[in-house]
Every structure is written in C-alpha cells, then in structure tokens.
Amino acid sequence: MARFVDPLVVGRVIGEVVDLFVPSISMTAAYGDRDISNGCLVRPSAADYPPLVRISGRRNDLYTLIMTDPDAPSPSDPSMREFLHWIVVNIPGGTDASKGEEMVEYMGPRPTVGIHRYVLVLYEQKARFVDGALMPPADRPNFNTRAFAAYHQLGLPTAVVHFNSQREPANRRR
Amino acid sequence: MDLKDGGGSERRGAAAGAGAGAAPLARQGSIYSLTFDEFQSTLGGMGGGLGKDFGSMNMDELLRSIWTAEESQAMASASAAAAAAEGGLQRQGSLTLPRTLSVKTVDEVWRDLEREASPGAAAADGGGGGGEQQQPRRQPTLGEMTLEEFLVRAGVVRENTAAAAAMVAAAAAPPVAPRSIPAVNNSSIFFGNYGGVNDAAAAAAGAMGFSPVGIGDPTMGNRLMSGVAGIGGGAITVAPVDTSVGQMDSAGKGDGDLSSPMAPVPYPFEGVIRGRRSGGNVEKVVERRQRRMIKNRESAARSRARKQAYTMELEAEVQKLKEQNMELQKKQEEIMEMQKNFFPEMQKNQVLEAVNNPYGQKKRCLRRTLTGPW
C-alpha cells in the first residue's frame, strides 16, 4: 500500500530532494525493531547499522535505494546538501535492501548541528546495473539525488521515507 | 568663557576617567590634528598653558590639558579636513584611558610606541632596514606627531581596536588602502555633528578672537584621515562632507560676531555622538540580532513543518490502521458466519471462544490427558 506523500511535501523532502511523485511501491524501513515512519526521530546511535528496508514490487523488477541528508552540515546552512549516506542497487522487488548490491557503503547519521532529515528514496530501475554502467558518486558531500537519478535514467521515485535525527548529548551516547 | 569651559572640561575629565569622554574629542577634531609642538605653543599663547612639558606629563594630565584646550579653543579652520578627522577619530569609539596607560608619562608612551613601530614598519616593508629608515622620516620626534595619531597609537582609544589599528596603518602608509573599516557613518548624524562644531567654533572664535593655528599641517595630517573616512564610509561620506563644509564656513562667519556664550552645547551633542559612536556597535549588534532572528524564524518554521509532517504521517497511519482494522473485523465476521454454516451445532459463543482463544481446545485436551492415566 502506497504511503501518503503529504508529509513529504510538508517536511520539504519533496522539493528539496525529489520532485513530486506518486508512490507506486510500498517501502518500510526499520532500525532494529523500530519502524521508521515519516518524520520520526531516530537516535544516531540507534542507526549505526543499515536499516532493514523492505520493499514490495515484483520479483523481476530491480530497485535502487538512496539515503541522503539534505541538512548537512546544518539545516540553516546546508552547504553540503545533500550528504550521501547509502546507495544500494539491484534490489529485487518484494525483498529487502540486503538483497541488493551496496554501491556506496552505509554510513550512519551524524548530525552535528540541528535536526537533520534523512531521506530514503527508492527508484525503479529500467534494467539491471552491471558494473560498467554505474557511475559512483565521487564524494559524499554535495550529492544530488535528482542528478543521480537523471544520469542513470531512474525517473521519478517510487517510494520515499524520511526520518529525523539529532545529535545526542554525550552522556546518552552508547 | 574660558573659566566656564574649563569647568565643563573638568567635569568631563572626571567622567572620562570612567570611560565616557568622547564628546569633546568628537566635537572638535581640529585640535587633534595639531602636532605636539603646535599644541604646546597654542596653550602657551592662550595663557592657559601648563607649566609642564608634555614629555613629563602622564597620560591623564595630557588628556585633561587637551580637553581644556579644545574647550576654550576653536579652529575656524575646522573645515573638510577637520570634519573628516573627526569622523576618523570618532569612529574609534569613546576616549578611554586604560589604567596602566594613565599613569605613564607621555615620554614613556612615546618610547613604547617607537619600539612597537619599528618592527611593525619593518614587517610592512618586507625588508629589515627599509622600514626603520622610513619610520624616523615620517615621525622624527614626538613634537611633530599629531595628537590624534599619538592618542590612537598609544591606545587611548580602545573601544574599537581593530578599526584603530586599521586607521593607524592607513595614516602611516597613505597609499595602502585600508582593508576594512566598518562603515558606520550616517550622514544625518554627520550633519548634527557639524552643527556642533559650528556652534562651538563660532562661539569660541567670537568670544576670544582666536585665530587658526597651523592650517597646513592639520590638513596634511587630515587628508590621510579623510581618505580613511572616505574609504571606510563608502559613498556616504564624501558628498555630505563637501556640502557641510560650505555650510559650516558660512555659519561660522555668520555667528562669529555673536558673543552669546553657546559653549555648553556638549550635552545634547554628547547624546548624538554617543548614539553615533555606539552606532557602529549598535548597527553590528542589530545586524547580528536580525540575522539571528531570521535564522531563528527559519528554524521555527522548519520545526513546525517537521511536527506537522510527523502529525500528518501519524494521522495517515491511524487512518490506514483503522481501515485495516475494519477490514479484518469484516473478515472475522465472514469467517464466523462460515463456521456457523459448517458447524451448526456450535453455539455462537463457542465459535467466538474458538476464534479468540484458539488454544482453548488444546488446553482442555491437555488437562484431560493430565488427569487421565493416574
């Protein structure tokens, strides 16, 4: 079941990271046993390891998952927008992200200033990415999801989830 | 007139000890453009001279004598150059005397300055000896130094040290454009100050018939200052300076024959000056505050958006779960109906029980087996 996009519009994920789209695939993400709903708060320490991202869709279709932080290094001055955290390609439909190929290794949220949004974007691939067809981004800062999608002809996203994260006080860090 | 002003300056001198003596300095830039030699001869000529030599005075006494002198003395030549110098000096903020400085004699301070200046000049020149050669040429003795420069370099004007440093640099090496001097000039306040100079100048000139001293030198010294002001203040300062000069001169001549004692103007102007003096800081503070406010508002908007997004997400979730729940209930109803049809002998309660407690049957079985064999 497709999620509503309204929270994404209000949370300015649509606009700052992706364009308006109609969700066609259901994607659920969970850090451990904690499900991620749009706009929920996740402690960075709880997100050290990649989340379990389950997607619907047909087994023959392949999907690309991108996780970025549009608020780096600070929401009021996002000079690094977007900071890339994760890219997984060739995820078969109906499975989870661990069945895909990690193109850019997962990096947990490390918000230094302010509350950052972390956006998980799912694209449907036109075809399987073989090694030569991919252009891995040079660097994590100043990544552009739209440009990446355009370059790899991914079209509009099929699902987006975002959560918030904030720097933890030192004593609460595990 | 002289007495009265002397009293005024004493009062202010006392205040200056507490760090609020910018008024006279700001009101008349002219006196600060005199060199020490000229200043001394001026004091002597007026009869209000102090017996002491400047070198042996401590800084506190020097300032006091400057204030006294400038109170009772007005420069009819307080023209463009003086005005510009005034702008330059005022920009430094209030004339405060650090404790450590006030007890030093002028000579001591001068020696300190010379010691500081030579390595600085050398560094500026890049070569070791070049700077030291130039330095003495520009400021061979204390006597030829202007009061303004001396005070600024001695660090009497402390509030805006960065600006002061930039100014000294500019004054010492005119062709070098100062990098950044905060543009705090405000033309309307500028005019207000010229008014103050006018009145004081006119009054004093009328009362005492004092003639300008050392026009050439001050203008020389002050052209540097005007350059600084021009650069620092950007486009604002240049035009007002010119117009107000004309206005000032005519006003000075017009009022010159009035012998009305207009001396105690400092207080109203002090207000203006204080406003202007702190104007730089206030402007900076206001700007900073505004930036902070904007950031804060953006942050608040983001926070609201976040909250709203989350609320919407939760509402959507609730809606979804409600629908799911209804669907499931409907399904349960159907199943129960089906069970009723398949096992007509079962009562509705039993069916419900079976559905709600699928292990109930099993439990009963277990109990029986437990009780059975023994």
UniProtKB/Swiss-Prot annotation, chain A:
PROSITE patterns: PBP (PS01220). InterPro entries: PEBP, PEBP-like_sf, PEBP_euk, Phosphatidylethanolamine-bd_CS. SUPFAM superfamilies: PEBP-like. Pfam families: PBP (PF01161). It comes from the Eukaryota. Induction: Induced by abscisic acid (ABA). May form complexes with phosphorylated ligands by interfering with kinases and their effectors. Belongs to the phosphatidylethanolamine-binding protein family. This is Protein MOTHER of FT and TFL1 homolog 2. It comes from Oryza sativa subsp. japonica (Rice).
UniProtKB/Swiss-Prot annotation, chain B:
Residues 14-23 have a biased composition (Low complexity). Residues 286-349 form the bZIP domain. It holds the Pfam family bZIP_1. Residues 288-307 are annotated as: Basic motif. SUPFAM superfamilies: Leucine zipper domain. Residues 1-13 have a biased composition (Basic and acidic residues). Its main location: nucleus. One of its GO terms (cellular component) is nucleus. One of its GO terms (molecular function) is transcription cis-regulatory region binding. Transcription activator that mediates abscisic acid (ABA) signaling. Binds specifically to the ABA-responsive element (ABRE) of the EMP1 and RAB16A gene promoters. Belongs to the bZIP family. Interacts with VP1 (via N-terminus). This is bZIP transcription factor TRAB1. It comes from Oryza sativa subsp. japonica (Rice). The gene is TRAB1.
